[in-house]
Amino acid sequence: MTRWTYTALAASIAFSIASPSVAFAKVKSTKKAAAPCVSESTMPALNVRALQTELMVAALSCGEAERYNAFVESRKDELLPYAKRLQATFKGRTNAFVTKVANNSSRNMDCVAAGSLFETVLSADHPQLETVASTDWASKRHGYRVCTKR
């Protein structure tokens, strides 16, 4: 071995002995962080936006642009208050929230299920969007929970 090799080896060993915490610093906690929370009155806005985003992703991924446009046009008066609530909650981060939901939707897109969802929201009996969106998949798409008081 050359003198340079011995020097590098000695420095490496000395560094390892002197700072054992470096070896452990990269170990991450196995505890999963709690999902962020919102007020109970805000949750329907998140769920409805998750529904709208699911349909938007289906429009792009499943060739459902015509039905998505029909949905937005027929439900714009119902969508608007939820959009305002979302903007009030997230302020300048609304686009980041919607992008996160869209990414989650695109990873799990099922065009057959999306087709059924379009049939539901465009049906003649016109169910409330809040009711349609109050399902487990909506909260899985946005990742929020209702805050609990301690």
What is each PLM-predicted segment?
Residues 36-100:
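Short N-proximal segments of mature Sec-exported proteins
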